[in-house]
Amino acid sequence: MFANPVVKSFQYGNHTVTLETGVIARQATAAVMASMDDTSVFVSVVAKKEAVPGQDFFPLTVNYQERTYAAGKIPGGFFKREGRPSEAETLTARLIDRPIRPLFPDAFKNEVQVIATVVSINPEVNPDMITMIGTSAALAIAGIPFNGPIGAARVGHINGELVLNPSNTELENSKLDLVVSGTEGAVLMVESEADNLTEEEMLSAVVFGHEQQQVVINAINEFAAEVATPAWDWVAPEENTVLNARIAELAEAKLVEAYQITEKMTRYDRIHEIAAEVNEVLVSENEDVNLKEVHTIFHDLEKTVVRRSIIAGNPRIDGREKDMVRALDVRTGVLPRTHGSSLFTRGETQALVTATLGTQRDAQIIDSLMGEKKDHFLLHYNFPPYCVGETGFVGSPKRREIGHGKLAKRGIQAVMPSIEEFPYTVRVVSEITESNGSSSMASVCGTSLALMDAGVPIKASVAGIAMGLVKEGDDFVVLSDILGDEDHLGDMDFKVAGTNEGITALQMDIKIEGITKEIMQIALNQAQGARKHILKVMDEAISGAREEISEFAPRIHTMKISSDKIKDVIGKGGAVIRALCEETGTTIEIEDDGTIKIAATEGAAAKEAIRRIEEITAEVEVGKIYTGKVMRIVDFGAFVTVLGPKEGLVHISQIAEERIEKVADHLQVGQEVKTKVLEIDRQGRIRLSIKEANAELNPAPAAEAKDAE
C-alpha cells in the first residue's frame, strides 16, 4: 500500500535520530516523522503552487503543537482537549521560523505552511531540536525553492565542558542553554541563556554547536537524495531594470538627504513624501504601473542608500559613529503605588517597567508534556501601537511580544535570587512606550532597575544591547545600539544581555551567509563595551537592591512547625487556616516539611497570625491554666477551647464549687472562661476544670485567713 517509504537513521551525540517519510500524510507537499530516542514529532509542509497575484510578501506560517497524548495524559479543564498555543509552543514555533525564513528566495511569494505536532515524548529529550531537524528534512524533500537544509543543536556548559544536546536533567546543572541553527556554511540563528559566561565561552559554544550539527545536515542531504522529489519548476521573475533606473533617478538623491534627518518621525514623514512624489510621477507616465512593485523597488533603494553610506564610513542615520550608544535617561521609583518601577530611555526607545511582589501562591503553574513545574519569576512585555506612532488592534499578546518577553527574562534569570533566599513570586511588566530599535534590550535594563527599586536582591545589574551588521563583499561594519531602520536594512540582529562579569543571554538572527567567527568576535567585544557603558549609567541611578521592600508589598514571615502539627493548623476541611486568613487579613502557605509562610502588608496582622499558629501548635500542659471559649453545652458539662481549636471537656462537677443542676445556668456558648488542665488521656482527650482554675487564680478569703493564723 505504501509505495516508497524512506527511513534514515543516524547517531547524533548520545541520541539516535530517525527520519521517515512515505507512510503518513501523503497528500501533503512533504511530511516527515522525526524521532530522537522516544521523542517523536510529525512535521508536514504544504506549499501552494501559485502565488496570489500582486502579493508583495512571503506568507510563511509555522505552527507547533504539543499533544497531551504524547505523554500519556488527558488535558485538564472542562473541554478536555488542547486549546490555543501555550507560551512554550509559541516560542518553539518562533525558534523553527527564524532560521528557515531567510533561506527562501526573496522573490518566492507562494504560501507555505509548516505544521509540527509532538506525538510522543521522552521527558528527558526536549522536542524542540528534533522538531527543527524534522522541519529541515520536510522542506528538503518538498521540492520547493529552499536554500537548506539546516541543522540544529543544543549546547550545554557542564563542569567546564561543552555538551551536545544535554538531557533535561543535565541542563539543571548547566551554566548554558544555547540553541544554534545554520546551514553547512553559516550560522543563521542563536538563542541562549547563560550564567555569566565570557564572550569567548559563548562564541566557542556557538562554533561547537555549528560544527556538531554538520552530521544532521549531511544526513538530511542523504535522506533527500533517496526520496528524490522533483524540484519545482519555479524561476524568479526578471528584474525590471528600466523601472529600477527610473525610481533611482527620481528618488536616490532625495533619499540621501532624507536619511540625514536624525529625528525618526520627521525622517519618516519626508520619506513618505518622496514615495508619494515618485508614485505621482510614475502614474502620470504610465497609468498601468504596478505600485506594489514600485513600493518594493523604492524600499530596496532605501536599503542601498543606507548601507552604502554606512560602508563608506559616514555617520549613521541619527548622526552617531558605529560604536556609539544613544543618550540614556534612567529613573527609578516613577510610580507611587507599585512595588518597584523604572523608566529607561535610550534615544527614541523607552520602557516603563514595573515589578510586583506576590506570595508563592501567585506562582505560575506550568503543566507541560515534560511535567508540572512552578515559575516564581514572570516577565511580560507589551508593545502597544502608540509606541511607534500608529493605531492598531490591542488584545492578547502576539508571538513577537511573547518572544521579546522571553528574551528579556533569559537576560535577568541568572541574577535572580532563589526562592529560598527571597520567598516571593515576582512579576515584571515592561510597557514599551516608545520604540526605535532594541526595545527588548531596553526591557532588560528597565527590569534590572525596577527589581532593585522593589528591593529584590538580584546578584548584579543587567543591561542589554542590540548590535547590527552591514556587510558588502569583504567590507563590513558592526553597529552598536541599532535603530529600527538599521535592524530592518542590515544583515544581522545580535542582542546581548549581561552583567559586568559576563553574558546572561544572547540572541542572534543572521540574514546572509558569510558571517565568520571573526565578525561574531568583533560584535561580541563591541557589545561588551556598550553594555558596560550602560551599566555604569544605570549604577549611578541605583546600584543595588533597596534595603526595604515597598510599604505596599506583602511582607513574608517564615516559621517552622512540626510536620505532625500541619493537620491542626489546616483543620477539618481547611476550616482553621481559612479562619486564620480571614480574621488576620493574611495569606498563609504551608509546606509539607512544616514550613509556614505568612504574607501580610501590616506587621501587626502577621504577628497575630504567628501568635495564633503558635497557640494552635503548642502542646497542652497538665496543670496549666488557659483562656478559652465555650463551644458546646451538653447535659454533663461543656466543651471549651484550649490553645486555639483544641477542645477539652469541663465536667458539670468541675464548673463551680457548689453542686449545679443545669450547665446552661452557669455557662453560655461563646463565653470566655479560664480552665485548668486536669488530665490528658491516652487518646489525647483533655479534661478541664473551671472550678480549680478559679480557686488557683482567686484564693478564698477563708483560706487566706487560715494561712495567716
Curated annotation (Swiss-Prot):
Domain KH: 554-613
GO molecular function: 3'-5'-RNA exonuclease activity; magnesium ion binding; polyribonucleotide nucleotidyltransferase activity; RNA binding
Catalytic activity line of the entry: RNA(n+1) + phosphate = RNA(n) + a ribonucleoside 5'-diphosphate
A cellular component term, taken from the record's GO annotations: cytosol
Residues covered by the S1 motif domain: 623-691
Cofactor(s) it depends on: Mg(2+)
CDD domains cross-referenced by the UniProt entry: KH-I_PNPase, RNase_PH_PNPase_1, RNase_PH_PNPase_2, S1_PNPase
Alphabetized UniProt keyword annotations: Cytoplasm, Magnesium, Metal-binding, Nucleotidyltransferase, RNA-binding, Transferase
Enzyme class: transferase
HAMAP family xref list: PNPase (MF_01595)
Family, as annotated: Belongs to the polyribonucleotide nucleotidyltransferase family.
Name assigned to this protein: Polyribonucleotide nucleotidyltransferase
Organism: Aliivibrio fischeri (strain ATCC 700601 / ES114)
The encoding gene: pnp
